[in-house]
Amino acid sequence: MGYVAIKGGGRAIAGAEAAVEALRCAEGPAGTPLTLSAIEQQLRLLTSRVVSEGGLYHPRLAALAIKQMQGDTLEAAFALRAYRSTKPRLMDVPVQDTSRMRLIRRISSAFKDIPGGQMLGPTTDYALRLMRLDLANESPEDFRAVSRRFLDSVADTDLPDSFPKVVDALRDEGLLPPLTRRAHAAFDITRDPLVFPVPRSAALATMARAETGSLLAIAYSNMRGYGDVHPTIAELRVGYVPVMLPHPVTGEPIEAGEVLMTECEVVAMFEGDATDGPPTFTLGYGACFGHNEVKAIAMAILDRALQKGMRDGPSNPSEDPEFVLLHVDGVDSMGFASHYKMPHYVTFQSDMDRLRTTQDKATAQPTQEGAPS
């Protein structure tokens, strides 16, 4: 059988794209297209994941990407990044203060009582993982009544605009090292390649838009024993952070909008010696766009592990910056895996030629060894 290089036909490619569109619309005569509002609101965690992994805070465009890619989060994040690359870069955003977050959820597993109190907010942490079969035939009237009942049951209370951070209390007690502010700008992973060793800001930026499953898998390896972070969540926050930008005339910071974010700070094993001062807890930090608690926790654990690896040298994969940061990006890894679907006819032909030559040599060798001298 002969293998030759061929070109893909334009008509075949167009037909493949048409088949994808046909399957998207194949619900039947009673089918109705998904609205972007329905995707953004009813599949909010899916939208959050795409916003986070796409590295662009635009929930409505994330919903469009989900619809276009038929629920494939990797492809949707890819589309969102591609869109971002077409937009002009207007300015560098100043460092934002997440302590001003308008909270919808806030918990701590380190302390029962925290300043401002714990706020469970929207979570399934305490729910049974049982199928709700009543949702299979949910009527529009019942659907709309759910939010109304919830809002009617919420008491009118005066809540503060922001809550103090738990780690600030730990710092005040000397259990965490004092916060040091650095003047240099954060590493921009959208413009500069990762050349190791990289600063911590590059690691945090890479993990902030990393694929959730990849980040979780490597962090889980540390949790299971391939590492010794042993974290406790000092505080996990979900809420809307006001984006402050300088006024174009006065230069004073003004609120230009807000972004939904998840932020996690974990405290880990204490360290220190006589030369460094008294021992203190160590801190890991994770934050990402949208509501994605697992990703923020995994990121905080890996941040702590990478800090240890950068200081003492890696003793396991989760402490190796090159291993972690070059293998958690979903768009990169998906692209490399998908490229194997493209034609490799010439390279495979070369592999077969080498194999056949080796087989011929192996077959001829016994005959040569048995020949009379």
Curated annotation (Swiss-Prot):
Coiled coil: none annotated. One of its GO terms (biological process) is organic phosphonate metabolic process. Pfam families: PhnI (PF05861). Belongs to an operon involved in hypophosphite oxidation. Exact function not known. Belongs to the PhnI family. This is Putative C-P lyase subunit protein HtxH. It comes from Stutzerimonas stutzeri (Pseudomonas stutzeri). The lineage of its organism: Bacteria, Pseudomonadati, Pseudomonadota, Gammaproteobacteria, Pseudomonadales. The gene is htxH.
